[in-house]
């Protein structure tokens, strides 16, 4: 018998297994690995697999008390990144037994909890995860799903319109509610608490909830349409968050909101369960995501955060605009928009999708386009996102020279014009500006909006881009 041999051995002897056939029940991860100079890619990939599963820096005698073969993560494939020196994609397979059922928190603690500070790596980024069907089935997922939301709101055949109330901090509850009412009356479907509006000295949450509910009901009575305001239930403790959600339910409003990254996955999953049990829609804001996902060589790609949110639960999530002021390339964005909405997504490296993902009927999430968009963007947004999206114009509603309600009218008219043109078979990409101009002839509100924002552009290079595909 070999017995226990103390000492340090190379990770790749145990954790680099290029002959391994992945199982249907494995969680698969694609990591972008940048090793330190002199560290071979196999050792770096194996180190990631080891440190995010059963390994530690030295051999321990207690390894003999378990079956490492059954529980270890395995680096099963490594490929160099085209156009980058010394950067590799390492594919790691994790056995399902390593993860607690129904816990996104535990999944992330295992896969990305420790290994990102590892000295042998210069940088590390989790690009994508393949979640096996067996694991997905342990999650409730979004409280409702896209079709259920449309049925609750009685809105079909078009994207939904929203608006974040600005200035985001400093308004009293009554003035805030007034701004909500004006927007909803003008034709928007939703208004939104800003992500940093929780319960501050200038506006406590209970006052805001009351005035916003009043605003929504008044607008509903006047327009004959169902209206909602995303009441942000994010709080300092889970108990307080649920207390706010309970109050929202007692007011009878249709939707609440949560900042899922700052609030945390445990809190988010609790809130999603509450929302399903009590018929509340759940709007998710991704505040803090760019801290994690913006750098191309380190962190975690947003498509991973989005998949995790679909498992944890949320009916809407902010997903970039492609055309506004915030980061988001078209192919990458559409890749994770499909991951949020569709039931089955094929592997497609040209859109940054590393694995085929089957969601086995887990409800979908509606992507929200928000950030620096206005009426001139409407044709592009309608074309890029299709019907199942929320288009959110904060400044693009409240910045209208005549006020909030005319700003809302302008957006609704522009949207209806784009949907009508699309349904008639017109090319929104080519004819977008003409469609908006035609509509503005019979809508003075839209004409005024077109004039204000005709020259606005946010032209900066995207930081996070796709790798060139090997020819």
Curated annotation (Swiss-Prot):
It comes from the Eukaryota. PROSITE patterns: RUBISCO_LARGE. It catalyses: 2 (2R)-3-phosphoglycerate + 2 H(+) = D-ribulose 1,5-bisphosphate + CO2 + H2O; D-ribulose 1,5-bisphosphate + O2 = 2-phosphoglycolate + (2R)-3-phosphoglycerate + 2 H(+). It is found in: Plastid, Chloroplast. The keyword Plastid applies. One of its GO terms (biological process) is photorespiration. The active site is at 166 (proton acceptor), 285 (proton acceptor). The keyword Chloroplast applies. GO terms for molecular function: magnesium ion binding; monooxygenase activity; ribulose-bisphosphate carboxylase activity. The record marks 325 as: Transition state stabilizer. This is Ribulose bisphosphate carboxylase large chain. It comes from Strychnos nux-vomica (Poison nut).
């Amino acid at each position: 018998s070999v017995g226990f041999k103390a000492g340090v051995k190379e990770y790749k002897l145990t954790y680099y297994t290029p002959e391994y056939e992945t199982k249907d029940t494995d969680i698969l991860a694609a990591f972008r690995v940048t090793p330190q100079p002199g560290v071979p890619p196999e050792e770096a990939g194996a180190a990631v697999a080891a440190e995010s599963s059963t390994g530690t820096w030295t051999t321990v005698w207690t390894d003999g008390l378990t079956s490492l073969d059954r529980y270890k993560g395995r680096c099963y494939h490594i490929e160099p990144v085209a156009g980058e020196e010394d950067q590799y994609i390492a594919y790691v397979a994790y056995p399902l037994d390593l993860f607690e059922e129904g816990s996104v928190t535990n999944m992330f603690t295992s896969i990305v909890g420790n290994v990102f500070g590892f000295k042998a790596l210069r940088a590390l980024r989790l690009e994508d995860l393949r979640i096996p069907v067996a694991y997905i089935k342990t999650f409730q997922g979004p409280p409702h799903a896209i079709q259920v939301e449309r049925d609750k709101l009685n809105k079909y055949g078009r994207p939904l319109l929203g608006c974040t109330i600005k200035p985001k901090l400093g308004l009293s509850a009554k003035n805030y509610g007034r701004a909500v009412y004006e927007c909803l009356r003008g034709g928007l479907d939703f208004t939104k608490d800003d992500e940093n509006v929780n319960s501050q000295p200038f506006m406590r949450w209970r006052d805001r909830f009351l005035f916003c509910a009043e605003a929504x009901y008044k607008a509903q009575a006047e327009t004959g349409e169902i209206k909602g305001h995303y009441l942000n239930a994010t709080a300092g403790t889970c108990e307080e968050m649920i207390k706010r959600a309970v109050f929202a339910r007692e007011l009878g409003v249709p939707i609440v909101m949560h900042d899922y990254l700052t609030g945390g996955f445990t809190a988010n999953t609790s809130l999603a369960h509450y929302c399903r049990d009590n018929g509340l829609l759940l709007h998710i804001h991704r505040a803090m995501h760019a801290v994690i996902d913006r750098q191309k060589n380190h962190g975690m790609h947003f498509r991973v955060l989005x998949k995790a949110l679909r498992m944890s639960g949320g009916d809407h999530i902010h997903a970039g605009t492609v055309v506004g002021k915030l980061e988001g390339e078209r192919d990458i964005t559409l890749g994770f928009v499909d991951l949020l909405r569709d039931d089955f997504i094929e592997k497609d490296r040209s859109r940054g999708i590393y694995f085929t993902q089957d969601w086995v009927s887990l409800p979908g999430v509606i992507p929200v386009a928000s950030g620096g968009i206005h009426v001139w963007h409407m044709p592009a947004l309608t074309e890029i996102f299709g019907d199942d999206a929320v288009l959110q114009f904060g400044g693009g509603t409240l910045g209208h020279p005549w006020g909030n309600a005319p700003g809302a009218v302008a957006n609704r008219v522009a949207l209806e014009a784009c949907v009508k043109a699309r349904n008639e078979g017109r090319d929104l990409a080519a004819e977008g500006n003409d469609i908006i101009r035609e509509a503005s002839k019979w809508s003075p509100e839209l004409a005024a909006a077109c004039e204000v924002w005709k020259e606005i552009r946010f032209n900066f290079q995207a930081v996070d881009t796709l790798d060139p595909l090997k020819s």
